[in-house]
Amino acid sequence: MAQEAMEYNVDEQLEHRVAEQPVPAEVVSTQGGPPPLQPLPTEVVSSQGAPPLLQPAPAEGTSSQVGPHLLQPAAQLSVDLTEEVELLGEDRVENINPGASEEHRQPSRVNRPIPVSSLDSMNSFISGLQRLHGMLEFLRPPSDHNVGPVRSRRRRGSASRRSRTVGSQRTDSARSRAPLDAYFQVSRTQPHLPSMSQDSETRNPVSEDLQVSSSSSSDSESSAEYEEVVVQAEDTRAVVSEEQGGTAAEQEVTCVGGGETLPKQSPQKTNPLLPSVSKDDEEGDTCTICFEHWTNAGDHRLSALRCGHLFGYKCISKWLKGQARKCPQCNKKAKHSDIVVLYARTLRALDTSEHERMKSSLLKEQMLRKQAELESAQCRLQLQVLTDECSKLHSRVQDLQKLTVQHRDQISQSPSGSQARSLNCLPSSQNQRKYHFQKTFTVSPTGNCRIMTYCDALSCLVVSQPSPQASFLPGFGVKMLSTANMKSSQYVPMHGKQIRGLAFSSRSKGLLLSASLDSTVKLTSLETNTVVQTYNAGRPVWSCCWCLDESNHIYAGLVNGSILVYDLRNTSSHIQELVPQKARCPLVSLSYIPRAASAAFPYGGVLAGTLENASFWELKMGFSHWPHVLPMEPGGCVDFQTESSTRHCLVTYRPDKNHNTLRSVLMEMSYKLNDAGEPVCSCRPVQTFLGGPTCKLLTKSAIFQNPENDGSILVCTGDEASNSALLWDAGSGSLLQELQADQPVLDICPFEANHSSCLATLTEKMVHIYRWE
């Protein structure tokens, strides 16, 4: 009876444990799959001398290899599981000494006989475990997946409660292990499946300690307890491989009321063998003081100094609070107030090489386009100029053809007959009107006045003079004298040395051309009293004039007899240089004769007179010049003046050994055709006017139309001996009037003012105004 009761108790206890035992743990797959079925919790007994037993490893996958399957730890694998098991409501799992457990189980297997019914139930239980093992092997992850140790921690409510229940736990543990001891005794009689190699067992020994304990009903009301099962590999090589590069997966499984389990996977540790971030990527994220990443908020946020270098705010603040108040990178002086917080997460240097290359290409293309547009505009302007010149030349050819037909038979071959006819063509002034003195202007108290000219557009007389404040503003300029109210105006500074030539443009209002001994030619606007253009001739300039056929060109006579031609559109230098044909003497006078002004002389050009001779530079097509040397007496020339309407010129000679007095010779310009059909320009004397016996100054004369507009010509010359200006009738050669002055007359200028004809004479200090009445 006692034996049957024992068999019944064993069978009933085993069936009860199989039927009512809750699933102790849930295997959480590291790959995120569904949890597999788990075997019942069993006690694994490690024996050093016995062969390895069939052991179901809780929450551990097995290796999927060809051949019979074994419930044993996989080679070179470390499986970590967390289990929280409730055995019959009050059982607890606790790590105990494996030696004590072995001593407690050995008497149980030896002294207690196992009934046949218990063996049948054990066999069915083993077959179920084998089927479960096959399922676990199917769900096991690959063998190359490294899994680290997993710890399930259990926290006891109090240390005193464990000490009180030690005795009862050992008793209950002995009773609860009786069926399991019978199971392991029977399993020794079963045929063993081939196990893995001894080498794998040596490399991966598994030591598991399990102790089942129960407590009284009063302990069930205490706080929740957490269990910790630590599965660690004892092999040194496994530990080394785990420390070098294995990824440790730590899983915690917590039992929730009702038998449900919630997986909780801890974050994986960083693998040190992964490729690190390159230094180039970290340059924009790292503080150069602490070599840590700066942040976009907090104490270590991105900051910059005035020099532009970047640091963490906390680091650079500490740095500047120390003794070295300089930038850590460039050693520039800095202070705490120079710190500027930058609202940027990271910094990256943008590669703009392609952009800069495209930008330079764009600038080059724009420059080429502007250059092409400028060339196109210049070509259009040249086309317009050539078109106008072509039309002018066409009209000129027609006029010349008409004049040639009309005057071909009238050209005389005898100079004497031509002179007689020229004298007869100049009518004499028969009326009794003459010039009356009106006013005197003191230009310069210190003297040194030299030349004057008149501007019709501004109704003013312009006189050259030295600076009135030579100590503050040295040099020479002009003074404007208004002919409307007969009052002097302001002084306009222009040159550094004495002015030798003045001329107004007939097309530009108030634009004055001046030549000076300071080797410059200047254009001055008298409307704004400013110099608008300066040309450096390189040598002292003695005379100047405007081109009446081409308003954009001017002439400048140099001290060596050369003539420089300037284009106002070219502000750099002259465009032509006309070299003298004979002696290199200063050009004392330049006068321009326009084209087709007279039937007797239709050619245009500039008349240049030096101290030795005179030349006429004919203006050809393409703005080229052809020289014609005029037949004149050699030496002694002091002035050349022209009258454009009648083509007459006035030449003044000094007294010489053949002539005792000053002479002013009126000449007529003429031409004849050579064998090649080219014109040869010349001049012949018409009338001679005599003056005083002295001529020390380079005085200027004047030739102009009679104010009566009767076609007669008047000539006015200066006489140094009498300090006066002599007025002559060009037709009769008679002296009409003598205009007295206090000093020798240096220049003479006729002009029209207030519907009256006036004449101005210039001495070294004053200007005398005479009116025709």
UniProtKB/Swiss-Prot annotation:
Post-translational changes noted in the entry: Phosphorylated at Ser-46 and Ser-63 upon DNA damage by ATM or ATR. ATM phosphorylation occurs at early times upon DNA damage, while ATR is the major kinase at later times. Phosphorylation by ATM and ATR is required to stabilize p53/TP53. Part of the phosphorylation depends upon RPA2 presence.
Compositional bias (Basic residues): 151-164
UniProt keyword list: Coiled coil, Cytoplasm, DNA damage, DNA repair, Metal-binding, Nucleus, Phosphoprotein, Repeat, Transferase, Ubl conjugation pathway, WD repeat, Zinc, Zinc-finger
Gene3D superfamilies in the record: YVTN repeat-like/Quinoprotein amine dehydrogenase, Zinc/RING finger domain, C3HC4 (zinc finger)
Subunit comment: Interacts with MDM2 and p53/TP53. Binds to the RPA complex via direct interaction with RPA2. Interacts with RAD51.
Its biological purpose: E3 ubiquitin-protein ligase required for the repair of DNA interstrand cross-links (ICL) in response to DNA damage. Plays a key role in RPA-mediated DNA damage signaling and repair. Acts by mediating ubiquitination of the RPA complex (RPA1, RPA2 and RPA3 subunits) and RAD51 at stalled replication forks, leading to remove them from DNA damage sites and promote homologous recombination. Also mediates the ubiquitination of p53/TP53 in the late response to DNA damage, and acts as a positive regulator of p53/TP53 stability, thereby regulating the G1/S DNA damage checkpoint.
Protein name in UniProt: E3 ubiquitin-protein ligase RFWD3
Organism, as annotated: Ailuropoda melanoleuca
